[in-house]
């Protein structure tokens, strides 16, 4: 898409659905051409934006869609629990591949690059910055640093058992604090996604329920088995 202003990108995704096209790692659908096809199908279905993991996947998708793309890189590091876009080089590569928004881990956990440097680099590359946070304190800190979007992405994923329900309270609190809020994390039905907007989210990201076929099939298979 042509380079839009920050406000134009936010306007395009506001009150809309973001499709996170991230297949199961090393699964049969974990191929750039398939990710691109999923992204194009998502746009045809009415998505306002996309979340794409990996530079190769982003490069394969960008020429075929006109909606804003949130780009991330996931890494498993030996010395940090932070996985989402941990390095400045990741930010540069995503921007050069065509991301409009770049998301990074916004938690307070130990990280290889300080978050202040990350948001600065994202803006230097001409992209909007999104922080994937786990609680209100992190979200407020990231907002103060200049992040354009604050997501509830990491709520429930920084230790302990993962809750079944989305973190509605975090979405409400972030919105009350004046953040542009991305509801993300366990919004796996149309009804839950609708609630996210109703309680104040500016937009909502859905992933597994849309693009991870292995997960979707397992939900149905397990439900059928439980009937016997």
From Swiss-Prot:
Name of one Pfam family that matches: NanE
Pathway linked to the protein: Amino-sugar metabolism; N-acetylneuraminate degradation; D-fructose 6-phosphate from N-acetylneuraminate: step 3/5
Keywords: Carbohydrate metabolism, Isomerase
Entry's Gene Ontology molecular function annotations: N-acylglucosamine-6-phosphate 2-epimerase activity
SUPFAM superfamilies per record: Ribulose-phoshate binding barrel
GO cellular component: cytosol
InterPro entries registered for this protein in UniProt: Aldolase_TIM, NanE, RibuloseP-bd_barrel
Catalyzed reaction equations: an N-acyl-D-glucosamine 6-phosphate = an N-acyl-D-mannosamine 6-phosphate
E.C. designation(s): 5.1.3.9
Domain of life: Bacteria
GO process annotations (BP): carbohydrate metabolic process; N-acetylmannosamine catabolic process; N-acetylneuraminate catabolic process
Enzyme class: isomerase
Function of the protein: Converts N-acetylmannosamine-6-phosphate (ManNAc-6-P) to N-acetylglucosamine-6-phosphate (GlcNAc-6-P).
HAMAP family, per the entry: ManNAc6P_epimer
NCBIfam families (alphabetical): PRK01130.1
PANTHER family: N-ACETYLMANNOSAMINE-6-PHOSPHATE 2-EPIMERASE-RELATED
UniProt family annotation: Belongs to the NanE family.
Name of this chain's protein: Putative N-acetylmannosamine-6-phosphate 2-epimerase
Species whose genome carries this gene: Haemophilus influenzae (strain ATCC 51907 / DSM 11121 / KW20 / Rd)
Lineage of producing organism: Bacteria, Pseudomonadati, Pseudomonadota, Gammaproteobacteria, Pasteurellales
Gene name as annotated: nanE
């Amino acid at each position: 898409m042509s380079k839009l202003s920050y406000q134009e990108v936010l306007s395009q995704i506001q009150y809309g659905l973001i499709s996170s096209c991230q297949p199961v790692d090393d699964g049969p659908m974990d191929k750039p051409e398939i990710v691109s096809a999923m992204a194009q199908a998502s746009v045809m279905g009415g998505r306002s934006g996309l979340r794409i993991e990996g530079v190769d996947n982003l490069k394969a998708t960008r020429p075929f869609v006109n909606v804003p793309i949130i780009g991330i890189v996931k890494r498993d590091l030996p010395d940090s629990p932070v996985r989402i876009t941990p390095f400045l080089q990741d930010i540069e590569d995503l921007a050069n591949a065509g991301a409009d928004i770049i998301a990074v881990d916004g938690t307070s956990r130990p990280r290889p690059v300080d978050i202040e440097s990350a948001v600065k680099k994202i803006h230097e590359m001409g992209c909007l910055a999104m922080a994937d946070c786990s609680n209100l304190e992190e979200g407020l800190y990231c907002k103060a640093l200049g992040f354009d979007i604050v997501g509830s992405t990491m709520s429930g994923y920084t230790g302990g058992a993962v809750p079944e329900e989305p973190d509605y309270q975090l979405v409400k609190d972030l919105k009350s604090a004046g953040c542009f809020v991305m509801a993300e994390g366990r919004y796996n039905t149309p009804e839950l996604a609708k609630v996210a907007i109703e309680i104040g989210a500016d937009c909502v990201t859905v992933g597994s329920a849309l693009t991870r076929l292995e997960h979707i099939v397992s939900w149905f298979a397990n439900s059928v088995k439980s009937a016997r």
